[in-house]
Design a protein with these regions (language model features):
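Glycine-rich phosphate-binding loops of nucleotide-dependent enzymes
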Residues: 1-441
């Protein structure tokens, strides 16, 4: 069968569950499933037919969900289930899932794997696109490895291991475990007290949040995406104003009336690696050397307030690209022409090289290869060991567990609990991520 469009793929029995769900938030489950497949003389007839078929699919594949629920009232785990139902309703025999656990709690991920095993047992083919080696080893029968757009290896999962797969993905041996000494926390560098943030639509996204980050430690914030972590980070870094509470950094106090923008926060000793490198971290149409000074272009070493010292900027960019292994190491190359991993290393190079007192890092390894992940993790730990305070926000629970000294868990804009990393239990964190407090668990 020749496939030239999504319609051709669906007709050939191929279904796709995208990393970012393709659902209409204000429609019900039933309306989302029937959308685009309407048959018969009336919409009501189509809905009745779809409802009967959905009830059968739910029973056959243990995909229970309230078909009359509106999508935006469902947790992400159930929204993903709706995407699977949509694909099965359209007759999918081959189901492709792209990074399916990126937005799930550990408990939701386990439930997804049970569903995928059920699909396999009933004769469906499941293709999992993921960079999470633990998941590959846990659920797959066969694994193929792509590197730089080429298929470089095929293995039976039972005949390989995480170390070999990582080496195949990167082209060299990769250190799988983060090696770090115990933290030696010093005085508080960042103190957040009773912080509230209300967005432009009047929704309270951050609710009475308080915590500290000390010099020489990494504090990780865990949580399913969309629970206020992004807004908290943007408030702390001066991108968004807040309505209540206070932030103290390097002895400076910021309140809802005594405000500080992102440039002021940088002067206070804060560096920020934003979670969306292309929207917040880079101007992709600019060259590498122009991006390497973004936000720091008024630095006297770059700028004598009459003109920019281009030669110095280019030489400085070359050194930083070499130190942070940015490839290709061409300071004149446009940022859009670098791979995602090298774009991220460009942002990391710019922020880490400023010798900040406080480093705020959002999703540091999103969309980067395992080799770049290893490198960025080493750099974060080196900053901690140099006595810097690090606030790490990530939806990757493995990353939070391996890098953090203390872990805060956010749900619905609130801090649900604090756990020492050495005592952390993945199941307990998963419950907190789902809004279940420890005493209620």
């Amino acid at each position: 069968t020749e496939i030239r469009s999504a319609h051709d793929a669906i007709a050939a029995g191929i279904g796709m569950v995208h990393q970012h769900f393709m659902l209409v938030d204000t429609f019900t489950v039933l309306e989302n499933v029937v959308l685009g497949t309407e048959t018969g003389f009336s919409l009501q007839e189509s809905m009745q037919k779809t409802e009967r078929e959905l009830q059968r699919l739910e029973k056959d594949y243990h995909l229970e969900v309230d078909i009359n629920a509106v999508i935006n009232t469902l947790p992400v785990g159930l929204q993903q289930r709706v995407e699977i139902l949509k694909a099965l309703y359209r007759g999918a025999d081959i189901l492709i899932l792209d990074e399916p656990t990126g937005v799930l709690t550990p408990q939701e991920a386990d439930h997804l794997f049970r569903i995928l095993n059920e699909l396999r047992e009933q004769g469906k083919t499941v293709i999992l696109i993921t960079h999470k080696l633990r998941e590959i080893m846990a659920i797959t029968d066969n694994v193929s490895v792509m590197r730089q757009g080429e298929m470089v290896a095929h293995r039976k999962t039972s005949e390989t291991d995480r170390e070999e797969l990582a080496e195949l993905m990167v082209g060299r041996k990769v250190l799988m475990q983060v090696d770090k000494a115990p933290a030696k926390p010093g005085s508080p560098m960042l103190t957040v007290k009773h912080l509230d943030y209300i967005d432009d639509f009047g929704v309270r996204r951050v609710k009475d949040v308080s915590f500290e980050v000390h010099c020489g430690e990494i504090v990780g914030i865990a949580g399913v995406s969309g629970n206020g972590q992004s807004e908290l980070m943007e408030v702390i870094t001066g991108i968004k104003p807040f309505q209540k509470g206070q932030i103290q950094i390097s002895g400076q106090t910021i309140t809802s009336t005594v405000r500080a923008d992102a440039a002021t926060m940088r002067r206070f000793g804060m560096a920020h690696v934003p979670e969306d490198r292309q929207r917040r971290g880079l101007v992709t149409s600019f060259s590498a050397n122009e991006n390497i000074i973004l936000g720091y272009h008024k630095n006297p070493s770059y700028n004598n307030f009459i003109e920019m010292d281009r030669d110095f900027i280019i030489q400085s960019c070359k050194k930083q690209m070499e130190h942070f292994d940015v490839r290709p190491d061409n300071p004149h190359l446009r940022a859009s022409l670098f791979s995602g991993g090298n774009q991220q290393k460009l942002v990391v190079a710019r922020e880490f090289e400023r010798d900040p007192a406080l480093l705020v890092v959002g999703q540091p390894t999103r969309g980067v290869d395992i080799g770049a992940i290893e490198f960025i993790h080493r750099q974060i730990i080196a900053m901690r060991d140099a006595g810097k305070a690090v606030l790490l926000v990530s939806v990757e629970l493995d990353e939070i567990l391996s890098l953090s000294d203390r872990i805060l868990v956010m749900f619905d804009g609130q801090i649900m609990g604090e756990i020492l990393a050495k005592d952390a239990d993945e199941r307990e964190i998963g419950l907190l991520m789902a809004g279940v407090r420890k005493e209620a668990a």
